[in-house]
Amino acid sequence: MLGRFLEVSVHSADIPASLAFYESLGLVQAAVGDAWDYPYAVVTDGRLHLGLHARDLPSPSLTWVRPDLLEHAPRLQALGIEFDFELFGEDTLHRLGFTDPAGQAIALLEARTFSPPPLAANHPTLLGYFEEFGLPTADLERSSAFWDSLGLVAFEPERGPFTKVVASGRDLNVGLYDVDLRSPVLTFADPDMAQRIETLRERGHRFAERLPRGMSTRDNALLVAPEGTWLLLTTGSV
């Protein structure tokens, strides 16, 4: 229903600073096209593709590519989805946007805006394995049904430090978190995450002062990017 996942799109007022941050963690740049008339860059670890946009936009947004978008739009509306915007002019990249029940911004484009670099499946970074886009929600049942209707497979709730439902797609997992987070997170996991966190602290990276309720500060942390993106570092037990 959504197409192929393209990127997590975030607004960055200082793209060079954001690039330096992500490259210091081991992510690499992708070659971008000329779809946008403002500065734009993409970094990736091979699983996560993060689009850095100089233009102000709902941040973070989840962006998919769907060919023949104009013809596909009525199928989304048939699900009861109301578009926040839709642009289908002759001289513009066709795109539309809407939000999920938790307020998460979702965008669909008709074509790609970058070319992924060739990376090994196990490309190493300081962050560990990108597991999912973590989305806080006050209504797990409603959010699960919404993402399931879009073609992701919502599994049974998992218990841990907090309750979550994983809505799994072929190229992105959305973790629906019943937790006290003010913003979505990029969730990375590694059994030895405590050592990774210590290394990042030694290198001077900035962390949020408070973790979600129930999460141990020994094995988990919230890394803060220059543009404000939150990266949740865990042992894989969330």
Can you say where each PLM-predicted feature lies in the sequence?
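Acidic (E/D-rich), amphipathic helical modules within compact regulatory domains
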Residues: 21, 30-32, 37-42, 46, ...
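Extended, low-complexity, intrinsically disordered tandem-repeat tracts enriched
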Residues: 52, 64, 108, 152, ...
